[in-house]
Amino acid sequence: MAFADRLLAAWYAGHPALALLRPLEALYRRVVTRKRARFLRGDSASYRAPVPVIVVGNITVGGTGKTPMILWLIEHCRQQGLKVGVVSRGYGARPPRLPWRVQADQPADEAGDEPLLIVQRTGVPLMIDPDRARAVQALLASEPLDLILCDDGMQHYRLARDLELVLIDAARGLGNGRCLPAGPLREPADRLREADAVLFNGASEDRTEGFGFRLQPSALVNVRTGERRALDHFPAGQRLHAVAGIGNPQRFFNTLLGLNWQPVPHPFADHAQFSARSLAFSPPLPLVMTEKDAVKCRAFAADDWWYLAVEAQPTPAFSAWFDNQLQRLLRKP
């Protein structure tokens, strides 16, 4: 297990040795708290877009189901007749220049795995740039839009936001409740009180602290050809290699177990780069991966490589709440 994986496991298990990192945690908390305070006071300038900006992010390190929720929000807004754009940091991407408009036929190392997935699934206009404010300006200059979804960027306060949605893994929660590097929190836990909504991935019902949503498997898709198959394509008890280069690989492996398959788990670092050699496992079995990983593997995929398509399913209460927020944000003065 890599050091980063061991540290992540310790954060969520509450390992006592992490107490040694508390002096560094105190320094980190001071830095992030002061940074946010400067923007709140107006000492540091924020860019406010002429259209509503909705930030979808988290305050923890590790996967929370953010990309599937972004996909749900895009489709839901489109059903209201809205033109939606997305901005993203483009973690791991190496574009020719910044900001960079992501197209569906671009290589993953140029566009970034998550932005490429979003564009391939939805065709939404999407701009990547670590400077989210600059990305929003470039996106609005390229075409008229009704609102912007910011993929992550909770801590990027140079971009003013009209709505904040924070996602949390329902099973792992906030881990030991400590900030980096003594815990998984990017900001102190009380930051949640300032968000407009908290969504718990893996909760089928709403909680006092926020709304629930689940990731529902919908199909198997062949990585090489794009052919879709029903989930019963593999019989119960099917052994298969399971690949996950995401923030919380175990959640993916548990999903496969819940489908009555027998996965041989192969966890990779989040945003890992793959090759045919790195995915050559023994014994020869079908291989199932996440959709985020699949966008990086199509060029060398074997015939029996598949990805599991999943759809975010928030509770009806969140859908109703979000519709009310859209009406408020888009109300003409």
Curated annotation (Swiss-Prot):
SUPFAM superfamilies: P-loop containing nucleoside triphosphate hydrolases (SSF52540). It comes from the Bacteria. InterPro entries: LpxK, P-loop_NTPase. Pathway: Glycolipid biosynthesis; lipid IV(A) biosynthesis; lipid IV(A) from (3R)-3-hydroxytetradecanoyl-[acyl-carrier-protein] and UDP-N-acetyl-alpha-D-glucosamine: step 6/6. GO terms for molecular function: ATP binding; tetraacyldisaccharide 4'-kinase activity. GO terms for biological process: lipid A biosynthetic process; lipopolysaccharide core region biosynthetic process. Transmembrane segments: none annotated. GO terms for cellular component: plasma membrane. Transfers the gamma-phosphate of ATP to the 4'-position of a tetraacyldisaccharide 1-phosphate intermediate (termed DS-1-P) to form tetraacyldisaccharide 1,4'-bis-phosphate (lipid IVA). Belongs to the LpxK family. This is Tetraacyldisaccharide 4'-kinase.
